[in-house]
Amino acid sequence: MVSIRRYLRVPNELKPSQIFKQDSLSPSKIGLQIVLLQIFYYTTAIVLFYCWAKLAGYDLNIKEWLFSWENIDFTNAYGLSISLLWLLDSLICVFFLTVIVGRSKLAWDFAITIHAINFIVVFLYTRKFPSFSWFFLQILSSLILIFLGTWTTRWRELRDTFFEGLVDPNEGEVGLVTPSQQHSNHSELEQSPIQLKDLESQI
């Protein structure tokens, strides 16, 4: 039973308290962060597509809208609407990037990784090379995640650094005197008259 628990135990770097820590860069943690961001990226898109289909009166076709590049077209309202929803998805994912990653130096890497995985998924689903319109949309979406994600994560880093500087780790220790310190102070007071007498004898 003990051995089974040992295998079922979650590694320390994969615990929720460690996933969102900024000072850990273990491969397992980075891999989990990529998976979480990809899940939120597609989940947000599904919610946006569902709301848009209900409001605009379109038949809901999640698989085609998510994993196909053929719907991305800038020459009609239908294709433009889907493109704008993808850009809105990237804008919302800036928040998830800030919370999950939280490091400005890694925002660029994670933004590119999300869209690289999306390209692989789309290519495997359609078995065709995407169009120029789709690639242009991915570039715009990547720029949103890179620039806004870098700005928000840097703001978070500066905020954490500012508040850490205001907290004194030694606060609360002032005024506390240990018994050993009391004994040393008492011995110093006892030795001071002797030193004064020695000075008087020398004079």
Swiss-Prot record:
InterPro entries: Integral_membrane_SYS1-rel. GO terms for cellular component: cytosol; Golgi membrane; trans-Golgi network. Disulfide bonds: none annotated. It is found in: Golgi apparatus membrane. Residues 1-29, 102-105, 155-203 are cytoplasmic. It holds the Pfam family SYS1. There is a cross-link at residue 15 (Glycyl lysine isopeptide (Lys-Gly) (interchain with G-Cter in ubiquitin)). Present with 238 molecules/cell in log phase SD medium. Necessary for the targeting of ARL3 to the Golgi. Involved in protein trafficking. May serve as a receptor for acetylated ARL3. This is Protein SYS1. It comes from Saccharomyces cerevisiae (strain ATCC 204508 / S288c) (Baker's yeast).
